[in-house]
Amino acid sequence: RKVVVAGKINELTEQKIEERTSWVGRINENYDNIFYSADSSVGIVQPPADYDGVYRRYLPYIQSDVTQKLVPSFGYALLNKYYGLKNNTTAKRSGNYFLFGDKKIPRYDRFSTLINFYGSSGTFPRVKLIDILDDKNFKTIDEINLGVDINTWDVSDYGLLSSGRFKDKVVLIGSTMPEDRDLLPISFAKGKQKGDNLIYGVEFHANIIQNILSGNFLSVQSKESELLVILYLTAISFYISSFIRKIKLRIGFLVEVANFIFVLFSIYGI
């Protein structure tokens, strides 16, 4: 089985356990997903927001006080399946990196990494779920009404199955309906109107998965390079301000000469 279900950490339950006001049986923990018992492959879908409410970071894993375990986030849980790792495999902290298989993922802070967004909403290709379900054994409403089999999944000539579109791909199933309110503001926008920096949760996780697959990461700038950039910009600013100052002095001198000549003309009527 290569399926991962989305799960959540119940923050209220976790808080009660931390305060020792509740004792929840670990055996009943299903991470708010009724399908968890079918495979026990779960990924947490609770990314952290920054202070401005924008989502820029991703947690490789989250610790559950209920189960006393580290649980991989959704993107990492899917990659566990892709790389053939155990379901509960989590990234390991090592210096300034998280180690995940043979990947070295730069850390932003102790617990998170930065997401290198590939674009705004709609960057990753989408396929309607009904087009996947519509095989020779499933009747859609359109097929019933028209009396014709469409079978977009497995029709021989142009079906999605024979197209190879899903071969060796990581496929995420999620809602792209605004009514479901699974929208996250990110640091990347189309720039056409206010609020077009929103992407759906399924797209959010797709970005970190693609980052890891392609090794395309964002790193925090080192303190040394920050200092060099500050010194460089300071020197440039000083040079530009000095140059402008000299120009102003020259212009001022020319203005004074022009005024002196004008006064001479006025006095002597030249």
Describe the predicted segments one by one.
Residues 78-80, 119-123, 162-165:
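Flexible, solvent-exposed extracytoplasmic
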Residues 133-161:
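A Trp-anchored, charged/polar loop motif used as the substrate-binding/catalytic surface
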Residues 114, 171-174, 259:
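Structured core elements
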Residues 1-108, 166-250:
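Non-transmembrane functional regions of envelope-associated proteins
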Residues 238, 242-270:
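Hydrophobic transmembrane alpha-helices
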Residues 11-13, 128-129, 145, 154, ...:
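Short, solvent-exposed coil/turn linker segments
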Residues 109-142:
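Helix-enriched interaction subdomains in cytosolic or periplasmic regions
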